[in-house]
């Protein structure tokens, strides 16, 4: 059965969630949409809110999953996180948060987790 891109994305996001939960993170929310962008996963690592971007690439013709998170995507990620935090009377300036990337290759077994991706 052929999956749509949305179904494939949801599948990889779910696999990323399970992976992060095995690493000790707690699930908060998924697919939080704002005008500026979407937050794939929101997790918690002890007291830290973790905004997770999930990326997948079947091949590297146009670059890796990691390479696909360009400056424009990073800005949308930051803006969406700030809007999510604002719902709780918080902001990036005062919240204990970080931005992690979970990147998949062709399969869910080919996974790379990069904590603090935006600090790299």
UniProtKB/Swiss-Prot annotation:
Pfam family, one: UPF0102
Gene3D superfamilies registered for this protein in UniProt: 3.40.1350.10
InterPro entries from the UniProt entry: Restrct_endonuc-II-like, tRNA_endonuc-like_dom_sf, UPF0102_YraN-like
GO molecular function: nucleic acid binding
Similarity comment: Belongs to the UPF0102 family.
Protein name, entry field: UPF0102 protein HSM_1206
Species, as recorded: Histophilus somni (strain 2336)
